[in-house]
Amino acid sequence: MKLKNSLWAKLQLRFPNLSFYAAKKEANNKTESLAGSVVDKRVPVFKPLILLLPAIFVLTLFTIIPFFLNIKYAFTYEKSPGHPSTTTFTMDGFKNVFESPTFGVAVRNSIMYGLIVLPFVMAISLIISSCIATAYRKWARGIWQTIFFLPYITNIVAVSLSFIQFFSTFGMFNSMFHIQVSWLETGDIYSFRPLLPMIIQGVWSGLAFNILISTTAMLSVDKNLYKSASIDGIGGIKQFFHITLPSIKSTTTFLITMGIIGGIKVFPLALFNNKPSDAISNGASTLMLFIYERTNVGSGAVQVASAAAICLFIIGILYSTLIRGGFGTIMKVSTNYGENYVWNKIKNSEVMNEYQAKKK
């Protein structure tokens, strides 16, 4: 190494411009970064549009067009099917939806499912992710992440069959508590009992994705923050609430949004042998299940299903606004509490008292 350095020094003395040419050649050999090649260069408008065309086509065909067709079918009715000239404006679809007793049960179950499952999934996944992220050895983190991710890739039919057996009248759940309750075969459309299997299955299946994303986010938090907090004598619980949670706020917001969408769109058909009539007659109706079942009910079915879909859209927006606002308020209060706590500590510290005394 010393020989190379001395040789390079002699060459530089003999050829003063050697360093300049070497640096220039090295710069020319470097590959251009993505930011420099795409962002900083003028690109014709049609090039990015060509790349976006497949996505735009799929989005238009399967989302935008069906959305407007759904609005059309919800407010119109063809007196003679196949003859557009007989189409008239009507609100009968919404009338049939609101008069249906199963629609109220569907709204009740969907909202209760979302309100219970989302907080449990978020709380449990954050706790487990925190334990995995603090694991000392990297191979242990990988093993635990793989174990907790297995429910996400497990076949939903196999999972549903397992839950059907688990919650049957003579299943394992009843055996553990020495009871005989028909959780999935109540015979009552207003029953609350099917909610328990639905909620437990929802929590179990929702943990996998949340744990994977939360663990990845926690591992990306700057470790120097934890070291500084440990030096100041801050415990692990306070570090979690005042360092970890604020640092993964964007990830938490994403998971809450996905949880809200999944909660309002719960579809427990597999728990009832893929028979929507069985699910509805046993009190397990949800908004998605109600819409699915109404599309197969004869004349005017599409109109009623379209009206129910619009109701689902409106309920989803209101539900999302309330839940996101609630979680946002909790995070804001927690952050403000932490800031006030630190500021009060600083104000009451000996250093601050000495500074104030000198200032006077």
Where are these regions (language model features)?
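Short, Lys/Arg-rich, polar N-terminal cytosolic tail immediately upstream
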Residues: 1-42
